């Protein structure tokens, strides 16, 4: 299962761009909250067709640059979850993978 969490701060976009992004989100059945300077959404479930990533890729040229990132937590059965991080910069979607590295357990007195 994947859990996406997005809060992006946008440089101000026009009403036409907002409508265009809403239309793209509807094509992917993704519920978003968008205004002239923000984009926010959460999604949890299967994403085998990577529709959330495709949505982000499709809106990147419209947005141009966004501050913040989209975090995707990939929940594994072994509780050693993986992470994917997405950013929009220069009209392109950038991607990084990540893992949480745990230190040794300690007793708190």
Regions found by a protein language model. Name each.
Residues 1-27:
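Short, extreme N-terminal segment that most often corresponds to the first beta-strand
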Residues 23-109:
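Charged interaction segments
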């Amino acid at each position: 299962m994947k859990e996406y969490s997005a809060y992006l701060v946008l440089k101000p976009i026009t009403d036409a761009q907002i409508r265009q992004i809403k239309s793209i989100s509807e094509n992917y059945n993704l519920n978003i909250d968008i205004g002239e300077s923000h984009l926010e959404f959460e999604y949890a479930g299967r994403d085998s067709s990577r529709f959330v990533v495709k949505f982000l890729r499709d809106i990147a040229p419209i947005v141009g640059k966004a501050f913040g990132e989209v975090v995707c937590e990939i929940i594994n059965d072994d509780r050693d979850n993986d992470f994917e991080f997405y950013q929009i910069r220069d009209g392109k979607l950038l991607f990084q993978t990540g893992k949480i590295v745990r230190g040794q357990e300690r007793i708190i007195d």
